[in-house]
């Protein structure tokens, strides 16, 4: 999937920047601002993301 960067802490919802666009995102657990994520799915206007280790 595409990659992005967290702009608002995901706990489990927040904002990520993907290709210059802000998206509402969901994840399992918590991901901090500045962490890189990969997009696993697009659900309407939200994306499901996973932290890149």
Spans of features found by a protein language model:
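Terminal membrane-proximal soluble interaction domains of membrane-associated proteins
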Residues: 1-53
């Amino acid at each position: 999937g595409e990659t992005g960067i967290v702009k608002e802490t995901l706990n489990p919802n927040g904002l990520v920047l993907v290709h210059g666009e802000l998206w509402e995102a969901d994840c399992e657990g918590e991901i901090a601002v500045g962490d890189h994520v990969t997009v696993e799915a697009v659900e309407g206007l939200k994306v499901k993301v996973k932290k890149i280790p």
